[in-house]
A protein has these predicted regions:
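The conserved Walker
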Residues: 17
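Conserved substrate/cofactor phosphate-moiety recognition/catalytic segment
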Residues: 26-71
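Glycine-rich phosphate-binding loop used to anchor ATP phosphates in small-molecule kinases
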Residues: 60-102, 110
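Conserved phosphate-donor/acceptor-positioning beta-strand/loop module used by diverse small-molecule
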Residues: 101-120, 154
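Small-molecule kinase domains that catalyze NTP-dependent phosphoryl transfer to phosphate-bearing small molecules
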Residues: 123-166
């Protein structure tokens, strides 16, 4: 696909921890030659310590992190034709913070059932997220509604390759529709 288009676009990979956000974003970035940023790297030190000790973040904990990701979206839209960012974006209010001042932004919602995600988290090594916090994340999660036209759903209760392929197709389709609209 040719990405020499007159606009820049960022896709945020959202969902609970264990849904495959980083894995899918990295695979899609490789295939599409896109820049990729894991939003976890933008968490303030206190947030990382809090999560590492097994405590969930409050909205006030998340706000500076979400603002940092919003700034990263601006920077990436200024320098890359196609960028992918990993961020849980569990609530509509969080997604709205990310949307502020960004028209070329879409979300890829990696959705899975609790049992599948829990099994993935229990098998994961070297991540500060504690699997017992999954219950809290599912309770916090606000599924995007019909009013969020910039959110695309991918079911992660299928093979990794199927999820990657579905995600790449969505990104290509969104870009293609923008090209057609600008023609």
């Amino acid at each position: 696909m040719n990405y020499s288009v007159p606009f820049y676009h960022v896709f945020v990979f959202m969902g609970v921890s264990g849904s495959g956000k980083s894995t899918i974003a990295n695979a899609a970035a490789y295939h599409l030659h896109a820049a990729v940023l894991d939003g976890d790297f933008l968490h303030p030190r206190d947030n990382i310590k809090k999560m590492s000790s097994g405590h969930a973040l409050s909205d006030s904990d998340r706000y500076p992190w979400l603002k940092a990701i919003n700034d990263a979206i601006f920077a990436m839209q200024s320098t890359n034709k196609l960028s992918l960012i990993v961020c849980s974006a569990l609530k509509k209010s969080y997604r709205n913070i990310l949307r502020m001042d960004h028209s070329n932004l879409s979300f890829i919602y990696l959705k899975g059932d609790f049992k599948t995600i829990q099994e993935r988290l229990q098998a994961r090594k070297g991540h500060f997220f504690q699997s017992q916090m999954l219950i809290t994340q599912f309770a916090t999660l606000e599924d995007p509604g019909n009013d969020e036209k910039d959110v695309w759903l991918v079911n992660v209760n299928q093979s990794l390759q199927c999820v990657i392929n579905a995600t790449i197709k969505i990104i290509e389709d969104v870009i293609r529709s923008h090209i057609e609209e600008s023609s």
